[in-house]
């Protein structure tokens, strides 16, 4: 019997591996058109001639191959400009043409990779040609219960905001979006949420640079009498050189949270408003953000509201990308009533020959993620917002937005296991890679005295080769906090392969689209073995 069981397990394991590999090979090389793709092309190492041909097509349209009149596929009609613009294409060193694109995104004719971004709420993505996007992810649990990570949810709150803007070719955009939340399983639960994001629009045809930095710290010290949390986040955007006048933009955001105690009847509300604006005669762009949190006590009613706004205006040929998003949540114990309100707004107003993209979104969470129990319970709201814009056809920006959700509830003795969910989809043009972070954080509540917080970080990276996208997801679970402040961490890795909708156009102009989705977990082997045994 033991030999049969062992043999069955080995067979199932081998078959599942073969099937997984066959599926991946089919997705990358399958369908007759894939057989023409060489290994060098799949790995992005094109020949010099291929790169030159693609550059000509990218800048001058398909007619560049035959020497005909350039045709601009998907691009706005070129307009002459006497002064440099961030959207300018220089045919000669002395002549400047400005391609002013409307707010909508256009795909590069060489790949026709349609801009797409999928998330629960409404992020916007525009993607053109090669560029890279990075998101930073930090996970730093404090002694009691504190998690810091991008667009994440812990016991109470989750917020994700990402924005990026790219103007010059070969410009890589980086953004970081951090959210921090803390939770205590005592009747008084305090939560914090903070997010920072910076965006800068390059304004010179010769040089462009986008930089963002953010810091979020959070701490929580629950005790029988009170629990308090304070979160502060700051960001600064780099100033960008311009050919006429100097322009610089800075933004900062500060967030703090209220605390409540376990005393018989107390309620607390917290409201944070963070905004920044800048304007100048030369190009400028600002982004500012957010933050919020609230906590409640043993008898009812906590409310939290947050308002984040960012505005930017400029008077001449400037690109402005302004986006802000935030989320607030409240938590409480017995007889809870929770009200969350979030407002996010962004505005930009350039005047002449310019490209402007603004995105704002707000969502309250009571309908999305809310858990109310007797004992101690928490509810949270989750909101993600992101925007990206790109100016030159040759440059591209891609963003990732992730929606996090959590469930937490506790009775006097029971604790719930971490539940994490992540929604991530990112499409980039052929031979461009995008690295992003998306994650969700689950929380748990335990005994009235013990404090526990669980967080899971899903870091996914995608590489797009022509028509297939492979995501490798690493799930890292960090649990921290107890009466003795002991901490432990567990890391688990799973293989998540998602081949999503993708579209491409070959050099002849024929386009093909296919959609397949498949998920293989290593758990499949165990389940299959169990089925065989049964």
From Swiss-Prot:
Residues 1-22 form the signal peptide. It is found in: Endoplasmic reticulum; Cell membrane. Glycans are attached at residues 31, 426. Keywords: Cell membrane, Endoplasmic reticulum, Glycoprotein, GPI-anchor, Lipoprotein, Membrane, Signal. Residues 70-145, 176-418 are annotated as: Disordered. Disulfide bonds: none annotated. GO terms for cellular component: endoplasmic reticulum; external side of plasma membrane. It is a lipid-anchor; GPI-anchor. This is Uncharacterized serine-rich protein C215.13. It comes from Schizosaccharomyces pombe (strain 972 / ATCC 24843).
